[in-house]
Amino acid sequence: MLQPRSDRHRAAAGVVTALLLLLVGLSPLSQSSHAQGMTTLTFLGPDFDEWVAFVKVANQIGKPMGIQVKPDYLPWDDVFQKALIDSKSGVRTWDYVYVYNTWVPGLSAAKAILPINDFMTSPAATSAVQPNDFITLTTAGLELNGKLWAMPMLAAPYMMAYRTDLFANPIEKKAFQAKYGYPLALPQTYKQLMDVAQFFTRKAGEKLMGKTLDQDFYGVVLANKSGGFLFHRYEHILVAYGANLIYDPKTMQPTVNSPQGIAAAKYYVALHKYMEPGSESLTGGGAERIMASGRGAIAMDALDNMLSVLPVAKLSKVVGKINYALLPTQLASRPHANVGDANGLAIYALTQHRDAAFKLATAVLNTQGTKQVMKEYPALVPMRASVIHDPEVRTNYAPVFNAMSTFLNGKPYTVFIPPLKEWVQAQDIYEQAMSAAMSGQQSVEDALNGAQAKVVALFKRQGYIK
């Protein structure tokens, strides 16, 4: 059969190229076989260790499929805006986009990402996703309007990590009992957390467990950097105090300065006195390094942040001295209140490789693929029941299994970010107010009243309220 003209020109060019390569002693096969027939998928995401691990495993699994992943890493808080701007501008560069659960409303409303359900058009495709295997307490944040918007990758339940040696020390137990009138124990309420944080906050030169400290010691360690880190720690206390997350979904009325919101903010500002100085500049990883250095009694953070540092011998001085527990309780009706936190892999709406993107995503984030990612990033908190209960995971990743068992068996009161496409904007307003209150620039009331007015204005512009 006669080749089309363009193909013949390419064939002729190929012969000439081969002859030239032979003349200079090069093999055309050695120069092109790696790229030949490979589909390259581009990934827009943060350079977090778990996503570096994902890319590595994706390229291992994808190689025999003829698929490779090329990452483009940005700072975490820039990924959301980049995905929004590029999708609105018609940029077709991306195939995958990292998604944090609070971004789902905005990205889905902007049609920047595709629901995974769009690909589940056959029994085989549905089987590849394994939706019934997901732990809904962890994955619900990636769902909206009955659709799953990203392949679940990493659960990030917020928990406490605490120094078991401190709480068991007889000197500290005796001193705590004398000062507060009840036994020293892991805090079950936020009042107890405040007491414990105050008690363990010490200056260099004071004693801890009978030994003189050469550095300051902090009762509680938290990351309070703006850009989401502060709000994602504070929101659990906000919910614990009975408040809505920024607004009432039933009425769409902002509730930033509600009595419950004011009480929660006052508590957090008071707790801030017992945190490490400079917490306003710290992300989760930075805060955990303070805890790992042996200078904190309790950390409150996403479980994977803590697991990626505290049990790691080359990073931590407290290996073998840490245990994990649910967050405290403020209201009996909201035990161990927790805001669902999830990270996933979304398929970019303008991808030019829909089928390949779906095929590789499901291969990497199925049961076996997730276990491979855990080998590269042992702190990964999986979102599949089949992985959590896998005998190999129980044995080789005992800290992950034990902590997640505590979380799931404890059945914390869990809420998820409401479906508001302007969520990130509203969150930033609230976070700025909290920063002002924590720094002493404004009173809690003034800061939250100002934030309330700004969120009301935002909601009016969007037509949610009059």
List each model region and its residues.
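Extracytoplasmic/periplasmic solute-binding protein
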Residues: 143-154, 158, 185-253, 296
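Glycine-centered hinge/linker elements that transmit conformational signals in sensory
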Residues: 192-201, 236-281, 323, 327
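Conserved N-terminal structural module of periplasmic/extracytoplasmic solute-binding proteins
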Residues: 2-5, 14, 26-112, 121-131, ...
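Short, solvent-exposed loop/beta-turn-alpha elements that line the ligand-binding surface or hinge
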Residues: 117-133, 174-186, 212-213, 220-227, ...
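Pocket-flanking alpha-helical
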Residues: 55-56, 77-115, 128-150, 160, ...
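Extracytoplasmic/periplasmic substrate-recognition and gating elements
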Residues: 64-65, 88, 166, 262, ...
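Hinge/lid segment of periplasmic solute-binding proteins
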Residues: 101-159, 168, 191, 210-216, ...
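Long, aromatic- and glycine/proline-rich binding clefts that accommodate carbohydrate-like moieties
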Residues: 319-329, 375-432, 436, 461-466
